[in-house]
Design a protein with these regions (language model features):
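Metal-dependent catalytic core segments for phosphate chemistry
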Residues: 68, 106, 128-185
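Conserved alpha-helical "signature site"
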Residues: 218-221
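MIDAS-like acidic motif and immediate structural context at the N-terminus
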Residues: 91, 106-134
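DG-centered beta-turn motif at the end of beta-strands
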Residues: 91, 119-123, 205-216, 261
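Von Willebrand factor
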Residues: 157-159, 169-205, 242, 248
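Structural beta-sheet core signal
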Residues: 118, 149-151, 207-209, 237
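Von Willebrand factor type A / integrin I
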Residues: 226-286
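Acidic/polar low-complexity segments with low predicted structural confidence
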Residues: 1-113
């Protein structure tokens, strides 16, 4: 009887342990599956519609994406830098070995790391997209040689200093305080940029402009866009609005588009990743 009782207790104990183990595994799986589903949902969610409760999760996602791109292009840079075999110098170096190439000499291929100028509309309708673009770019510091950032609504200021000394998340409130919450004036902002910072652009610079191109019926100053276009390696305009809205109401997008190498609808973090990948690709052709 005593043995039977102990066996029964042992059976119950094992059963309870197994039940708890299964419950723990199920909870873990459900939590991981839930997290993965949430991430997949956020990748496709309009940046302006991200729930504030998901902000930290979004920052993690953006940093992870940027790290993956940085790793990919840092490797490609190493691989490409070696260039091709310098036959003449290799033969000359190995004369003492009857021309048998014990020591190979490679032609060095110079690869310029990207120079990027980011010009972001931080007025109400577009501020969320600007935040994530800046977070993405500033997480790519190991593959970008120089990054200068500007923000505007009614006028434009350089924000590189703020973002050098603060994380993007901490810097954004200060930037908005200085230049946000005003009626957008693209013409005035382009004038501020060309008067004070045109020297930040040369033939190796990609200019990334983020904005909806809605200028409250003020002069769009497309003449200044032409100047920027002619100086840069490329001008890429990211617009959170769908293309069907470009050129409607006070949108000057179709006029600006004429002075962009690329103009694309960009409203999700997945769009951002694809476009930034395309930019990096132009510098690191394998």
């Amino acid at each position: 009887g005593d043995l039977a009782q102990r066996l029964e207790q042992g059976r119950r104990y094992l059963f309870e342990e197994a039940r708890q183990y299964i419950n723990r595994q199920f909870e873990l799986y459900a939590r991981n599956a839930g997290e993965q589903l949430r991430e997949e949902f956020l990748l496709e969610t309009r940046l302006g519609a991200i729930d504030p409760r998901d902000a930290k999760r979004m920052h993690r996602i953006v940093r992870r994406m940027a790290k993956q791109l940085a790793t990919k292009y840092a490797k490609r840079r190493k691989h490409t830098k070696r260039g091709v075999l310098d036959v003449r110098r290799t033969l000359r170096k190995n004369m003492a070995h009857d021309g048998i190439p014990f020591e190979t000499i490679w032609k060095q291929t110079k690869i310029d790391r990207p120079k990027i100028v980011a010009i972001c509309d931080v007025s109400g309708s577009v501020a969320a997209s600007a935040r994530f673009l800046l977070l993405f770019l500033y997480s790519l510091n190991e593959v970008i040689a120089t990054l200068r950032a500007f923000a505007f609504s009614g006028n434009l200021i350089e924000i590189s200093d703020i973002l050098e000394h603060k994380e993007v998340e901490q810097g954004i409130p200060e930037i908005l305080e200085k230049v946000g919450f005003r009626p957008t004036d693209y013409g005035r902002s382009l004038a501020d940029f060309t008067e004070n910072s045109l020297d930040s652009i040369d033939r190796r610079t990609t200019v990334v402009i983020l904005g909806d191109g809605r200028s409250n019926n003020t002069d769009p100053r497309t003449d200044l866009m032409r100047i920027i276009h002619d100086r840069a390696k490329s001008v890429i305009w990211l617009n959170p609005e769908p293309e069907t809205f470009w050129g409607t109401g006070d949108s000057e997008m179709l006029r600006y588009k004429a002075f962009c190498h690329v103009a694309q609808h960009c409203s999700t973090v997945k769009d951002l990743e694809r476009i930034i990948n395309d930019v990096l690709k132009t510098y690191f052709r394998a």
